[in-house]
């Protein structure tokens, strides 16, 4: 067992696994949710999709849009229906060094991603896409003033003796906004309504690049399922319809770093649904009906999140909403690593420096495993002459050879798996840290120093990948080897080149982590080898 072969093969397996997992996320992000839909409640889940136009007619032309501005959001709201048709994230730029804000929601030629809400039911005013209410507003723009913590944007509509007030409530520093319907029934008859709220987006392929694909599609949460993706492909295959028996859950459209989500107000019997109309996909919630007697009033409300994937803030808005920051199956390791990274950054003030500090902490914590690995391999190397003599003496008798090898290991107190086991135990930490860095919106457009202006983007001059490849080459040269096969030697020599090519396209934050990890490996390797030599365990 030699360290060079083990380290590089494990690293190759790790990168291959991560690339394959990312490809799987993009191509087949979630299995069909049939079983989950059936298990979410013993109650039937009637499909809300049947209430609205199965094939909507011509969408109404907008009478006008109003602009709503806070410190973190700039929204455009269509006065026809009162939908959010545009959302700028004021504190996130569209591109590095750009003054233009990142646009999350928009309704443009060829691309639609909007947040719709309305009232349906027997007396619903939003049942037809071609006959939605035209709301009246007191101004064309609303702005959160200095010293003001809350901004209310009321829109009114009256029909058949019923007064409707749809109000958007936004708060300073928050990406969560409330949508409230206040309905006053003076029609002389009972009126029944239920509120719906969904996100609509063009069906499209997953985002990202070939080397770093990212998920773009639907996701939801119920009492039985904390978090589940429901891709555009899933929506096209089957409309989702889940009854939320306790009313808790949410429906979202997510993409790399950002998300939009509707959260109902914990009303038992809420229906979570998807539907596809042409090239558009909807995912949302439909709250149960309320009957309003004449002369009475009622309120309907839901919360809309539109912004970056900020775990702490999202967790405060709704249970499990923070899980849209998807760390994969090793989330229980990745989440604490991200928290530690953010904690370090709060002191050092630079995400690149925080990554370096975190790498030293992680590798320091794994030092006992690393030391055990090199010690075991040194002991195995000391046994090579005895093992070779044993092979020559026994010949092709594999059973006898195996028995005598085990006796030799027992006599010399050597664990033949000691060199591999520490590497296997380290792999989950490496994978979890990869996802923690990959999913952190905080790294987006965050500079390190010099030529690295964005840790979430690839190195523009490929300096970090080249340094990383050089560090792998040094590790390979410093590691003693027992490989004698010429083909294996060529493969081992070629591995740093192959890894360098892979990392040319990786975000520089990830490459920085791997480079620093290799440097720490070189330091630890040198110290461990010197200590082993003093003990008489030769490493060469």
Swiss-Prot record:
The chain crosses the membrane at residues 6-26, 342-362, 417-437, 455-475, 496-516. Residues 36-47 have a biased composition (Low complexity). Keywords: Cell inner membrane, Cell membrane, Chaperone, Membrane, Protein transport, Transmembrane, Transmembrane helix, Transport. One of its GO terms (molecular function) is membrane insertase activity. GO terms for cellular component: plasma membrane. Its main location: membrane. Pfam families: 60KD_IMP, YidC_periplas. CDD domains: 5TM_YidC_Alb3, EcYidC-like_peri. One of its GO terms (biological process) is protein insertion into membrane. Belongs to the OXA1/ALB3/YidC family. Type 1 subfamily. Interacts with the Sec translocase complex via SecD. Specifically interacts with transmembrane segments of nascent integral membrane proteins during membrane integration. NCBIfam families: PRK01318.1-1 (NF002351), PRK01318.1-3 (NF002352), yidC_nterm (TIGR03593), yidC_oxa1_cterm (TIGR03592). Required for the insertion and/or proper folding and/or complex formation of integral membrane proteins into the membrane. Involved in integration of membrane proteins that insert both dependently and independently of the Sec translocase complex, as well as at least some lipoproteins. Aids folding of multispanning membrane proteins. This is Membrane protein insertase YidC. It comes from Vibrio parahaemolyticus serotype O3:K6 (strain RIMD 2210633).
């Amino acid at each position: 067992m030699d360290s060079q072969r083990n380290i590089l093969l494990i690293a190759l397996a790790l990168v291959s696994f991560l690339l394959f997992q990312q490809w799987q996320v993009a191509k087949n992000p979630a299995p069909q949710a049939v079983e989950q839909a059936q298990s979410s409640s013993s109650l039937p889940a009637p499909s809300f999709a049947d209430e609205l136009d199965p094939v909507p007619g011509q969408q109404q032309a907008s009478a006008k849009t109003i602009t709503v501005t806070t410190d973190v959001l700039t929204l455009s709201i269509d006065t026809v229906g009162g939908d959010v048709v545009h959302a700028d994230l004021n504190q996130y730029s569209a591109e590095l060094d750009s003054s233009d804000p990142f646009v999350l929601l928009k309704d443009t030629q060829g691309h639609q991603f909007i947040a719709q809400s309305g009232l349906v039911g027997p007396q619903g005013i939003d049942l037809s896409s071609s006959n939605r209410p035209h709301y009246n507003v007191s101004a064309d723009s609303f702005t959160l003033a200095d010293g003001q913590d809350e901004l209310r944007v009321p829109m009114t509509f009256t029909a058949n003796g019923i007064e409707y007030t749809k109000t958007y409530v936004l708060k300073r520093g928050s990406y969560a906004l409330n949508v409230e319907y206040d309905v006053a029934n003076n029609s002389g008859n009972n009126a029944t309504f239920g509120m719906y709220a969904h996100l609509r987006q063009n069906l499209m392929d997953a985002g990202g690049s070939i080397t770093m694909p990212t998920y773009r599609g639907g996701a939801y949460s119920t009492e039985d399922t904390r978090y589940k993706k429901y891709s555009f492909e899933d929506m096209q295959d089957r409309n989702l319809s889940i009854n939320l028996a306790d009313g808790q859950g949410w429906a979202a459209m997510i993409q790399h770093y950002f998300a939009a989500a509707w959260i109902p107000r914990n009303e038992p019997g809420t229906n979570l649904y998807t539907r596809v109309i042409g090239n558009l996909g909807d995912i949302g919630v439909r709250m149960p009906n309320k009957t309003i007697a004449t002369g009475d009033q009622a309120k309907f409300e839901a919360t809309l999140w539109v912004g970056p994937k900020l775990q702490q803030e999202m967790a405060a808005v709704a249970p499990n909403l923070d899980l849209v920051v998807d760390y994969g199956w090793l989330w229980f390791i990745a989440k604490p690593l991200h928290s530690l990274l953010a904690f370090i950054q709060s002191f050092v003030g630079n995400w690149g420096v925080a990554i370096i500090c975190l790498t030293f902490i992680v590798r320091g914590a794994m030092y006992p495993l690393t030391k055990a690995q090199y010690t075991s391999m040194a002991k195995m190397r000391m046994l090579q002459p005895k093992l070779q003599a044993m092979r020559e003496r026994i010949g092709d008798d594999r059973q006898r050879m195996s028995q005598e090898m085990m006796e030799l290991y027992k006599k010399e107190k050597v664990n033949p798996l000691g060199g591999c086991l520490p590497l296997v135990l380290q792999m989950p930490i490496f994978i979890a840290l990869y996802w923690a860095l990959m999913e952190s919106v905080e790294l987006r457009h965050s500079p390190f120093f010099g030529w690295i202006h964005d840790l979430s983007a690839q190195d523009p001059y490929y300096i970090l990948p080249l340094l990383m490849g050089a560090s792998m080459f040094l590790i390979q040269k410093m590691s003693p080897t027992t490989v004698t096969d010429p083909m294996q030697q060529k493969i081992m020599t070629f591995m740093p080149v192959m890894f360098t090519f892979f990392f040319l396209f990786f975000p520089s934050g990830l490459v920085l982590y791997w480079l620093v990890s290799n440097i720490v490996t070189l330091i630890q390797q040198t110290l461990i080898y010197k200590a082993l030599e003093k003990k008489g365990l030769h490493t060469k």
